[in-house]
Every structure is written in C-alpha cells, then in structure tokens.
C-alpha cells in the first residue's frame, strides 16, 4: 500500500529525497548549508524541503545509522516530529557526539531520514484512578527505567 506525499523543493539545487534501496522505510534528507560542529555542538540545519504530511500520519526524522557510527552525528530530539499541519521547511537539530573531533556537514550531504507513519489520534479521557476505570493491574505496574533488569550486566 502506498500513500502520496506532497513535497515542495525549496532549494532546486538539491535532489528530491529518495530511498537508498527498494523497500527502505525512510527517505534521505539533504543539508542546504555547510555547517561545522565542534565536539558536543548542535545546530539547526535546513533541508530545503517542505512536506504536507496527510492527516492521521506523522513524519519522523531519524538519524542515519552510518553517520552515527562513523562520525558521531546524531539528532538532538530523535526522532524529530513533523505534524500533519506543519507546512514549513523541515529542519534537523544535529549534534556532534564525538568527544574529540569536529565534524563538517557540507551542502548536499545526506543528514537524516524521514519516515512517514500512521498515527492513532487518541482522545484523552480523564479518570480518577485506573482501578475505578476498570483498567486492571498489569504485571509491570508502574515499573520503568530499568525495571525489566539487565542493567547490571550491560
């Protein structure tokens, strides 16, 4: 099943986003500008692209795994969210996680990937307690942040 995504190329000098391989979930996003990131530095980098995410869907901006492994480039708010109502340019909050080496992003570099997924638009219903609402206890309860174990043997 395929859904169309309307895109506006704000910088005609850059290619349209594309998948590296058939069946890949994400399309690559390109940098419009040259940016130098010192270790630990972050920057909001323009992509030269605007999209019209269909209602009931969301765009998620993920890091490119190869860049994360090779040079420590990641996204501060990973994944970034592009809501269906947003019509501005997609920008990516990049960060250089390398503790020593600066990193240079050049115009035209593939810096992130955009995934578009369906999203459930839930209606919030306030209840006084989960018990009163008939929502049974679970084996997990309120356990989080390491409650499933494994943290001692990383």
From Swiss-Prot:
Key words of the record: Hydrolase, Magnesium, Metal-binding, Nucleotide metabolism
Cofactors that this protein relies on: Mg(2+)
UniProt binding sites for substrate: 64-66, 77, 81-83, 91
Pathway(s) where this gene product acts: Pyrimidine metabolism; dUMP biosynthesis; dUMP from dCTP (dUTP route): step 2/2
Enzyme class: hydrolase
EC number: 3.6.1.23
The keyword Cytoplasm belongs to this UniProt entry's keyword annotation: no
Single GO BP term: dUTP catabolic process
GO molecular function, one term: dUTP diphosphatase activity
The UniProt record lists the keyword Kinase: no
Reaction(s) this enzyme catalyzes, per UniProt: dUTP + H2O = dUMP + diphosphate + H(+)
Extra facts: Each trimer binds three substrate molecules. The ligands are bound between subunits, and for each substrate molecule, residues from adjacent subunits contribute to the binding interactions.
Oligomer status and interactors: Homotrimer.
Name of this protein: Deoxyuridine 5'-triphosphate nucleotidohydrolase
């Amino acid at each position: 099943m395929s859904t169309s995504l309307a895109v506006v190329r704000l910088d005609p000098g850059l290619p349209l986003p594309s998948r590296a391989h058939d069946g890949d979930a994400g399309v690559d996003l390109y940098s419009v500008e040259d940016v130098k990131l010192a270790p630990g530095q972050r920057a909001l980098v323009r992509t030269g692209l605007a999209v019209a995410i269909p209602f009931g869907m969301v765009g998620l901006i993920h890091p490119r795994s190869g860049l994360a492994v090779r040079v420590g480039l990641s996204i501060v708010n990973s994944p970034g969210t592009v809501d269906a109502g947003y019509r501005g340019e997609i920008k990516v909050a990049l960060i250089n996680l390398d503790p020593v080496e600066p990193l240079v992003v050049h115009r035209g570099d593939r810096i992130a990937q955009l995934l578009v997924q369906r999203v459930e638009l839930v209606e919030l219903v306030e209840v006084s307690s989960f018990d009163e609402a008939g929502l049974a206890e679970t084996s997990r309860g309120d356990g989080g942040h390491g409650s499933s174990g494994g943290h001692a043997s990383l």
